Amino acid sequence: ITEYTPLGSWPTDDILVDETIKSMDATPDQQDLVYTITVQGHGDYPTEKVIENPEITVSGAKDEATNNQWEYYINEIHEVDKFIGKLKDALAQRDEKTILVLWGDHLPTLGLEESDMATGDIFKTKYVTWNNFGLEKQDADLTAYQLLAHITGQMGIHEGTMFTYT
């Protein structure tokens, strides 16, 4: 790993594109479940200015320290967005049927309160799916532990070790 976030505390997520594809290529004659966890958007968000020339600037927070925290977070999430685009493009080139599921397991540690959220709940995050074979979108309000069963059910997968214990 050679690329790290500006604070040096987390590797950047772009390394995961090639690693995910390598994992899928390692089993050419079987279906894969590749569970890739990203970390680039995590961390303590610095109160001092860290990114010298940010692609996205932030203003309007209660003080400069909070602006710096949000600016750091937003720019890291912008980099994550680029990673997701690269991963989606790499998966789109494959002949293997693929579903990409993206979700966040928590909101950033930026002092958010329920009143700050459109849902009124700081413990809810959105999920997004993409596929390369035209599977119709199905919106569902799911908990994290229901998501795997929902996605595999869409694919017609109802057997295997992971279903033995559900």
Regions found by a protein language model. Give the residues of each.
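Solvent-exposed soluble domains appended to multi-pass membrane proteins
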Residues: 1-166
